[in-house]
Amino acid sequence: MAIVNAVVGVVARHEDMWSVFRPSSEVSRLNAAVASTGGGGGASRCGADSAVAGTGLVVSEETDRLLRDALALAEATGGAFNPLIGPLVTAWDVKAMRAAYVAGVPLPPAPSERVVEAALRASSWGLLSRVGERRWELRVPGDSVDSVGGVDVPSPRLDLGGIAKGYTADACRDLAVAMGARGALVSVGTSSVSVFGTRADGSSWRAGLRDPHGGPTSVAGVVELPAGGMASLSTSGDNLGPLGGVRAVCAGSAAGPVAGSVAGSVEDRRARETLRETSADGGRIFDHHIIDPRTGYPAHAGVRQVSVVASSGVLAEALSTALLVDPSIDVPDVVARWARVTGAPASAEIVGLVHAEQG
């Protein structure tokens, strides 16, 4: 019971440091202290206190490490993993689209090109920088352009959720081992798993991979994790799926009803009848809710789910996210870059990849 209580304490502490939903977290404080690179010596755009404004925010050692990891992995993946994707997620507001679909009402419009371009400017991971020992700063774009075609460029927003679960799972596992556990499996948020040793009967730890085309409890496969040592598993997926089961999206005045035959359940038929589509260069722009942070638009990779086993939960999380956007990413190259940054041996392997159904 002592191990369980200690692990729960780690989860709570990390939540306090990194949750974007807690105003006092270090991530929220960085977001509240977005500093301009323009005149005024980096004065806070959001009116933060003088201990933060213009000088950056001093963070804990763990946050400092996680931020350095985030930037290293953003660079290693060519931006396919991006801890500053928040403005783009807000611009697309897929949660609202999904809510409308579930309610059986017309979907809200997709963002205009100007809105996407403005959000893309605020989503550059280069806006986050380490300006001193454990001191970090988040800046607005420094090109003196405050709007795109009349659309204001939003403030950048950091969110470490893409790798924090993996870090937390590893930390909990390591603590359990340090306290005497001979075998451990830690699962954080259902998508991040860290293991050590074996099960009580000596067999390897196994983890089921959800089937994104099936129901909530459907399993696409089972992964047997390396026995005896430590390993981390991350699964990233399009949990919403193609809205209504078709590759389409509402797009305001440019939209029209989806053409062609309609098949499937009553719910799918109703959704398809209310969906609208936007074309870009002759193709539909919306496959699912996963946004490509490099383009600002939903990814067209044709992948619904990716699972990665790696030597680090942070590495596994970033890779599974990046591969969902671009499955052509050179995994060995990312691993080699990561090993150089951390100074420790690293490994990663894709153990599950589910393609989107065509329909």
What is each stretch, according to the model?
Residues M1-G359:
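Mature catalytic core of soluble alpha/beta enzymes
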